[in-house]
């Protein structure tokens, strides 16, 4: 897991082989988003606001599990 400087997101991990993006949120909860393209995972890590990028590009767009 990679720690990110965000008010909403604590850590992020991406497995390119399975296209699974794991996000651990600051206020608890770990979610695994399925079939996330590498460009989206890279975008999350590179974004000036990780929380905004998550909201705009990941939330409600990918199937997830806890």
PLM regions: where:
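Acidic/histidine-enriched, beta-strand-rich ligand/metal-binding domains
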Residues: 1-66
């Amino acid at each position: 897991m990679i720690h990110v400087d965000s008010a909403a997101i604590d850590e992020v991990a991406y497995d390119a082989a399975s296209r699974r993006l794991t996000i651990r949120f600051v206020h608890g909860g770990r979610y695994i988003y399925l079939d996330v393209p590498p460009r989206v995972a890279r975008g999350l890590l590179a974004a000036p606001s990780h929380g905004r990028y998550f909201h705009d590009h990941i939330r409600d767009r990918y199937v997830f599990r806890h």
